[in-house]
Amino acid sequence: MSTIEKHTQIVKKTASKLGFDYCGIAEATFLEEEAPKLENWLNKNYHGKMAYMANHFDKRLDPRKLVEGAKSVVSLMFNYYPQQNLDESRNALKIAKYAYGEDYHFVIKDKLKEFLKCLKEEIGEVHGRVFVDSAPVMERQWAVKAGLGWKGKNSLLLNKSSGSFFFLAELIIDLPLIYDNPSDKDYCGTCTRCVDACPTDAILQDNLIDGSKCISYLTIELKEAIPDDFKGKMENWVFGCDICQDVCPWNRFSKPHKEEAFLPHADLEKSAWEEMTKETFNKVFKRSALKRTKWEGFQRNIHFVKNEAS
């Protein structure tokens, strides 16, 4: 076995040992085909008020600008599909499944740090950085290049065996490895279930999302008042949205995760969120992704969906 084969085997085994469901590897190169797509998306203001999306254009397209001497992008998938959904009846306030438990940034980042540590212990001098939705990395595009799946019409990564309820993460390292074949087939075909189900018409042609219309954007990223145009369209989502994933036929293959940290927080079972004080919110959701919207944003979302129903 060659050194490069041995190193690749160590990477794949370490990913499995740390609980990652899928691991693929791509060469760290410039994403030339993505440059015009990203530029077009930004020029059409599909990023809404997310000004940071226009920053670090070159770094988004070239991992070697993030990690000096980068040779490989290790793409990872970690399942978060719950054992049981929280109350999603018609009048229940709803939050995205990824926010049921602890903040994935903390949980996955800890695993990634351990990953890099393991590589250094087994291989020796390995330099790199770890990423989980926290830097200008085009994670879905890298996952496709690493053979983990294809980009669906809802722009999410779809895996033929397991669907889309996964966190994506990356290690960008200066270690040459054996690269996986990229996914070159789109298995969505003529299906338009996600497009048809989106209540705000955020899903466009060519696997594009108008982020400024997406319920996840409106309830998390948007810091000002939610425009009245969206009244009657939120379907009681107060943090994120899973509609386009819930209707996707590929998610019939989703299996419950085994990560204790992602089990629902006890207070998520309660329905009196609109009466929650700022102090209680900060205490209860200290390690939750819900804190991203802050108490003020959470209350804004609740009042918006409550008022749109009246």
UniProtKB/Swiss-Prot annotation:
Give the matching HAMAP family.
QueG (MF_00916)
What protein name is recorded for this chain?
Answer: Epoxyqueuosine reductase
Transmembrane region positions? Answer: none
Primary location: cytoplasm
Instruction: List where in the cell it is found.
Output: Cytoplasm
> In which residues is [4Fe-4S] cluster 2 bound?
C198, C214, C241, C244
| Keyword Transcription appears in the UniProt entry | no
The record's Gene Ontology biological-process terms are:
queuosine biosynthetic process; tRNA modification
- The organism is Cyclobacterium marinum (strain ATCC 25205 / DSM 745 / LMG 13164 / NCIMB 1802) (Flectobacillus marinus)
